[in-house]
């Protein structure tokens, strides 16, 4: 399975790639903003996307909307410092599959990855 990690922080992208590796997902593309994420999703069939909220050029929630507007149905997990309940609800309404608040324990993100993939019948 191919995954996409979207975050403007290189350090966070590396952390998320490490979490994906722990979930046995090693084929990973990286994007540094929402606009780049939508462009990637238009060209590549991803099995999973990990998306930050606050990024330059296009917010993560707008990228989720853009990806869903393309007809893409892959799981998208928001991984963000936006901890307000209203943000979680907004993300889920926009099409996010799940939500993880930074900072997080590595086991938490791995568990969320497995959870969303199980919901869509994907095994890793």
Describe the residue ranges of each PLM region.
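Two-component/phosphorelay signaling modules centered on CheY-like receiver
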Residues: 10-29
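Acidic, metal-coordinating helix/loop segments flanking the phosphotransfer/catalytic sites
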Residues: 30-48
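Acidic catalytic/metal-coordinating carboxylates
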Residues: 33-36, 59-65
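Receiver (REC) domain active-site loop signature in two-component systems and cognate sites
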Residues: 55
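Short, conserved "switch-loop" micro-motifs in signal-transduction and mechanochemical regulators
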Residues: 82-83
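C-terminal output helix
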Residues: 104-113
């Amino acid at each position: 399975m191919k995954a996409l990690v979207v975050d403007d922080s290189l350090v966070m992208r590396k952390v998320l790639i490490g979490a994906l590796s722990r979930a046995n997902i090693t084929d990973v593309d990286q994007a540094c903003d929402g606009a780049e994420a939508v462009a990637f999703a238009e060209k590549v069939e991803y099995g999973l996307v990990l998306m930050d909220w606050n990024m330059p050029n296009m917010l993560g929630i707008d990228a989720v909307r853009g990806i869903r507007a393309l007809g893409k149905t892959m799981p998208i997990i928001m991984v963000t410092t936006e901890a307000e309940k209203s943000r979680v609800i907004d993300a889920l309404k926009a099409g996010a599959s799940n939500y993880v608040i930074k900072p997080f324990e590595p086991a938490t993100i791995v568990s969320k990855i497995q959870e969303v993939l199980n919901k869509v019948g994907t095994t890793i």
